């Protein structure tokens, strides 16, 4: 996505009613993901592992988008994605990770991801996720 395309998209997303859950054990990555989501006007919350993400949904939480790390303690992203899909959760899940060989990426996708991006997440990569998952704001 070019800089002009990003600039063109930002005003449309600023009015967004989208919600996102950031699932990552790294404070640095949590902060980056939150800043990018905030920049696009997407309300977001953060949890530090897959079990916490599952617990949020078990408690009635619901989000349009989940940004899921793969490598986390307690319950990793693959396990959490599988569990959420087994629960019938239809939120779009994008895997966002630094560590992914082809086998791991395939396993993560097969767990129920809708998209996958390598870290570091950038505004362009986030907009790519939103477009691929058909999150468009009607103006």
UniProtKB/Swiss-Prot annotation:
Residue ranges of every copy of the Response regulatory domain listed in the record: 19-134
Cellular component GO terms held in the UniProt record: nucleus
Record carries keyword Transmembrane: no
Post-translational changes noted in the entry: Two-component system major event consists of a His-to-Asp phosphorelay between a sensor histidine kinase (HK) and a response regulator (RR). In plants, the His-to-Asp phosphorelay involves an additional intermediate named Histidine-containing phosphotransfer protein (HPt). This multistep phosphorelay consists of a His-Asp-His-Asp sequential transfer of a phosphate group between first a His and an Asp of the HK protein, followed by the transfer to a conserved His of the HPt protein and finally the transfer to an Asp in the receiver domain of the RR protein.
Xref: InterPro entries: CheY-like_superfamily, Sig_transdc_resp-reg_receiver, ST_Response_Regulator
CDD domains: REC_hyHK_CKI1_RcsC-like (cd17546)
Organism annotation: Arabidopsis thaliana
Consequence of gene disruption: No visible phenotype.
Subcellular location: Nucleus
Main location, first listed in the record: nucleus
UniProt note on tissues of expression: Mostly expressed in flowers and siliques, primarily restricted to pollen grains.
Residue numbers of 4-aspartylphosphate PTMs: 69
UniProt keyword annotation of Iron-sulfur present: no
Family indicated by similarity: Belongs to the ARR family. Type-A subfamily.
Species classification: Eukaryota, Viridiplantae, Streptophyta, Embryophyta, Tracheophyta
Keywords: Cytokinin signaling pathway, Nucleus, Phosphoprotein, Transcription, Transcription regulation, Two-component regulatory system
Pfam families: Response_reg
GO process annotations (BP): cytokinin-activated signaling pathway; phosphorelay signal transduction system
Function summary: Functions as a response regulator involved in His-to-Asp phosphorelay signal transduction system. Phosphorylation of the Asp residue in the receiver domain activates the ability of the protein to promote the transcription of target genes. Type-A response regulators seem to act as negative regulators of the cytokinin signaling.
Gene3D superfamilies: 3.40.50.2300
Stated name of the protein: Two-component response regulator 24
